[in-house]
Amino acid sequence: MSIGKKLFPGLLLCALVAPRVTGKVMVRWTQRAMPPAKSLGVSELALPWSAGAEALMDAARDRGYRVYLEVTPQQVAAVAEMGTKEGFAGLILEPGPAEQRDAEELLRKLRIAYPKFTFRLLLSEGKQPQRRGQLVYERDGILQVSSPTAQPWVDSNLAVVRFAQAFHPGSTPLYTFAWSASDPLQKQLGPGAAEYALAVAEAGAFHADLILDLPENLQNSLAHDDPDAWTTWKQVQRFLGFYVRGNRDSLQLVTSVSVWTDSEKGSYEAVNLMARHNISFRVLRKEDLNTRSLKDVDILVAFSTPEKEQIEIISDFVAEGGTAVLVNVHGSFPWQSTNSVRRTEQAVVYGVGKGRVIEFSGPIIDPETFAQDIRRLMAKERIPISLWNSLTTLVIPYRDPRTDHTILELINYEEEPLQFQVQVKGSFASIRYETPEHGCCETLTPRHVNGFTEFVVPNLVIGGRLYLQHAAGQKDGHASNNQKRTGDHAEKSLSQ
Amino acid sequence: MPWSKAIVAGLLLAAFTATSAAAPELKASLFHKDKYIMGTVFEIVVYHPSSDHAAQAMEEALQEIVRLDGVMSNYKTDSELSRLNRTAHFRAQVVSPDLYRVIEESLSFSRLSGGKFDVTVGPLVDRWKAALRGEPVPPPAEEEKLRACVGFEKVELIPPNQIKFHSPCLQIDLGAIGKGYAVDRAVEILRARDIKSALIDAGGSTFYGVGSPPGHAGWLVHLRDPSNKIDPQVMLCENSVSTSEQTPKSLLGNESAGHIIDPEKGAPLRTKYALSVVAKTGTVSDALSTTLLLVGPEKGRGLVEGVGDAAAIWVSSEGQTEIATSGPRILTEGNSRSDVSVTGSAQKMCMAEK
């Protein structure tokens, strides 16, 4: 799909008073010919390490790029040694699936051995962001399966990013993906401007970094000044500019759910579906569960088995009104002695203090229903954000602690103009909306209803950003859940 | 959807080779287009020699569905249906031919089903959808009040193009028929563009097969099987299949919610079945699927025979099946599928029969 007609050429993005929240995009380049960095609008190239990589590296440096080399764990030491005289900017480590666990330790050692280099870990589980249909293309035809009307499926990298933020703390997640073409026409045409733009928008909205894979024909066309290729790329540049690196580190992710887990195994699909249903969550490693990490959290989804200290933390959390959902976790726990018990086919619900503990005895085999259940468990009056009539949009809420303003990043995987309604917890006096296509900023009209602010997003094509500000001097409950929990969960759950 | 596809992929396979026969039309290539409309994804696949022609035809068909969404949506406040729902209580309203026709067809199904199929059930659907989102189940008094708003006999059609509501709180919701109607109109567009081999999918719940794929007697569609044991299938050729199933139960045991409402009881339907129904048009299969799920297999048999040229299969999560047919075959395990791969002549026969 071409978005050329939807974009407004020549629009300059205005400088924003509020901070930019951004992701860094590197372009993966494999062809000898390349346009200057200034023209491409990208300062960093990722070059896969291979026999011809040194010549490519020279060409890239001549064209004004900072060069990163993509290497395997087996190659990394030798290439790093060579790099002390070659002068590339850094190495991107691509561990195989079996090497993921050791990658962090390898990076630590490399950083000590080669302190002048930047070392990045590349997440290999990335997938092309897209809204998908139901039909599956087999080698020789189509697979079609009837069902009740299905919601549009969204392939996003949010779960991958959230796991990386937990398991590789201290570094911005860096991922890449291969373009997936499901039918002959797509294979023939390759990705278009909208697909590149969506990839850039997604990484930017998630505050992650991306290596964008460009097909060889686009690389060569750009290098040889093909006008069509540059028309495409100029549309992408608008998104690169919109999501440029800023002071995103100062922004805090607003979450109401924490997922506590040892690994992605066994929890990935549940987390992926939570992301799909716009449940804002963060992932906690086993060692990260503490009273502080549960502050402002309504629901703890636990895939790890708690030990004595963690059992106490969970007990305190639910006693104060929180909901703990234990998945396939077995053992004797204090809440099991309560008289307030309700059993379903798959779960046992214990009323504890002002909150509740829900134990699922087995793994989650229906992550879609599980994610919807998590959404239902959220107290209505405390849901940070809801969207209506936009099943192809993900929203990522952030808060600027310096100003107490809320910033919402929107990504529409349909890549078509969409109007929809938003409800945000808190009372906001000013709402400004900017997009890569239209720049900054359109003022939206808020409506205040029962502690929430409601408004209409008039036209989201791929990416957009909302700035929600309180009236001067006002700082009330905002999209983050920093209010005291109301503590009626036990009563609610047991009366279901 | 990775997890669900992983579940079905092992069971289901449809291999349509475009190379096994020698007819001229087999030079056609496969083209695909999809779009998010009516809260789901409509997909069209077309076999045609020209990519430009196929792309244009698919785009026009999808744009027709977009147009109809603007007519039939009850989510869009500016849709024609929303305007009708706001004003038809006061006086008869002039409506477009599409809205008149789809409501007329809806009312005929209401009469046929003795009120089990009822597009005026909207207020109850809205309330129970809220319950699905976690809001409290409506108390009996509220439910009773909402039920008073429901009743297809309170909708008056005034030919040729006016509609009036005889209830101050009646609301029409075309969710149980609108997608099927849209599929039929899209089929008309494709036919008008001389497309002879195409499949339209409305979010997985309604398929229509135009002609057949090259070298095959029809479009093979695997039907919903909550037991994962039966693998029912149907070959579509100038006909449609629709599937209905109640919203899955919450893992937490909240069984009181669901999006398919029994108008008689004013509450979500309780059923162990998933239901698929084959019929001549998308409108009929879509409306029948909800109706037959509501009435169940015993009463449903008569309806299937009454409609004619239809077939239905009820499949429970335990693998219990009930089949009713007045023409089309629904294939299940042990019911061989010898007609899947055929030569071009069979494909032409599919076209000739129509």
Residue ranges and their predicted role:
Chain B
Residues 2-354:
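Mature catalytic core of soluble alpha/beta enzymes
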